[in-house]
Amino acid sequence: MSTQDGFATRAIHDGQQPDPLTGAVIPPIHLSTTFAQDGVGVLPGGFEYSRSGNPTRAVLETCLASLEGVDSEGQALIGVRAMAFASGLAASDAVLRSLLAPGDHLVIPNDAYGGTFRLVDAVL
């Protein structure tokens, strides 16, 4: 799709190519947790385990990057990328590790999600 297409058109179509195996116009939802490998670290489809990435999330990331990656005049912005995660804790971990350095202080509420609290308390 072109960055000149409207927001709604890009939201519906960007990142979505017909499935090469079935011809399905809408990309299928991939529920698989693991993907075949030709050898250790040799990933013919580019995916290994759904926790680190899968085709469904890749389509979502492409579409979101397209929607967020244009300026007010519809021109593409360079280096714009979207990231989708397998869980909320994975997203929290990525954001916190990208923003904080060892020794930084972070204030979180005492009723924060337990996994996030343990991440902050024991890892960061």
Feature-to-residue mapping (PLM):
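Structural motif
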Residues: 28-29, 81-83, 104-105
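Active-site catalytic pocket residues across diverse enzymes, especially alpha/beta-hydrolases
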Residues: 99, 123-124
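N-terminal glycine-rich, Lys/His-bearing helix-loop that initiates the first secondary-structure elements
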Residues: 1-47, 54
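Glycine-centered flexibility sites
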Residues: 15, 23, 88, 103, ...
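Conserved N-terminal alpha-helix of the aminotransferase class I/II PLP-enzyme fold
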Residues: 34-94, 115-122
